[in-house]
Amino acid sequence: MKDFFLWKGAHDLAYASSIASTWIWAPAIFVASSKAYYDGLWGFLMFLIPNILTLVFFAYFAKMVREKTEGFTLVQAIESAGKNQKRLHLAVSLTVLICSTCVQFLGLHLILSQWIVNSELVSAIVVSTMALLMVGTSGIKGSIQTDVVKYVVMFVCGVLLLFNTDGSTINLAGHSGKSVGELWKTFGVATTIGLLSAPYVDQTFWQRVFSIDKEKVFKTFIMSAMLFGLIPLIFGLIGFYSGVGEIQVLFGNGILSGVLALCVLCALLSTLDSNLCAISSIVCKEFGGSLAIGKLSMVALLLASSFLMILTDITIVELFLIYGTIRTCVALPTILIILDKYDKQRLFYATLATVLIAPIGYLLGGEYNYLFTIMALCLPILGFKNETQQIELCKTGKKNW
């Protein structure tokens, strides 16, 4: 069963390509292009830079965790926090996996609706079948191996599309007319916080962290940041040069549309099959399920995400920002637990309050919803405890003001 959830001994470049491919996620292609077209250089950078920095910052944290512990899941790494805190983390992890999978479905449907089919259900069935074929029998090993191929395909497809973009001049100002301040409030804040907090609660990252040799974790994640940056950069350039904001419209219904569909499909499958591996590892390692039950959980995840897509009218960017706020709720608690700088009871109640308030506040907050994303990041600091200071107080019996 272990080989299904961790794959040791792969080449560094294979791990880095897998991390980059998983982090790209299909909608990043659309977001990079549309932000460049509509919001210009500033809007594009508000998406690109946080994405790259996320992998760079997490490299330091992942190295520290691997030096301290071995395991399969994030929840195993925070065992000391107690059952209630673990349940909160599990609930958020499962919610994020459902939302992330739904976002991948939405990304592919944007392409298929222009090219082949209009049914969201058909789109979900097609990509679900492909993802299950990739990892249903081999698990994380199959995911990492195919990610290498998928990254190469994405890069080649992106270059082909860039050289066939119908535009002779570059527009760095964008077409929306929004100021930098407006962009920062409506997109930049939630995006930056949501992205920077993402890996700490994302089981797809932790499976790779625990698969990589501890001496190579830092180097591998830095390499993945560089590999990742190339893909949105290519599609951002397409947005700067193009005369259309929607990339799926830009390349019409011909051969180039097929190239775009292949690129999106590879990005989607990288994240999707990683999500399937993540859900199975959580079910088996945290709930004691058998390998067969773990595989059934993959199907359950696909069904739940399909229903979310079909029964709502939510857009890619909206869902991305919403679940970004949700996963932010447990990012700081994860860091505090790993650093052993927390009070168990205070951290639990601070995390619980954050999980209950921030996502709902974001949904109802209108133009001020970004404030709830900030709250999701900051409120858990109430659970902070400086253990070193506590020890000094016990020794001296007095406070130093």
Residue ranges with predicted function:
Residues 34-47, 105-121, 141-150, 246-253, ...:
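Transmembrane helix-loop boundary segments of multi-pass membrane transporters
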Residues 6-70, 193, 205, 210-244, ...:
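Membrane-interface helix-loop-helix modules in multi-pass membrane proteins
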Residues 98-105, 109-122, 126, 130-142, ...:
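Hydrophobic alpha-helical segments and their helix-loop junctions in multi-pass secondary transporters
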